[in-house]
Amino acid sequence: MKRIPLTSALIGLGLPAVGSATDLNVDFTATVLATTCTITIVEDGGPAVTGSNDEYSLTIPDVGLDKVATAAPEAQANFKLKASDCSNGYSKIFTTLTGTTVSGKLIVNEATSGAAGVGMGIKRRDTADSTFFTPNNTDKFEWSADEKASGVPLTVALRETTAGAGRTGAFQAKATFNFTYE
């Protein structure tokens, strides 16, 4: 930053005709790309979703470790990613997931002194656990035309990171959804 004022001063001294000009005509051409969509997280038959803009929370009620270990419905919650205000310039929406992972596809518990051996996975609704999205990966999923109109139905699930290794306690994890458009 210190070189910028010095350089500007030298240019002004070296080009006195430009420095004393009274009129300056500038032709500026810009290409405006289409704006992106507004993406929100909404309830969809599961616990309440709180928050707005870029910070949402979904709270799964207290659940027994036996439910987590057996992948019972009580150890998961449904929600939707909903797109609105999308530009007509986009025909495709792609989503990737980021977060601190443990055990490949599960996001680690960030609660201090919390549950051990338990992670959080996110997948499309009504699919097997083997389809959990892989965080921090180039894998992405594309929204269908119906999903662009009505939202992408997803499930967040608590699962043991290693069978039989789960321990009870508080659980809190953060996942970030990233969107690209074509």
Describe the residue ranges of each PLM region:
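Gram-negative bacterial Sec-dependent N-terminal signal peptides
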Residues: 1-20
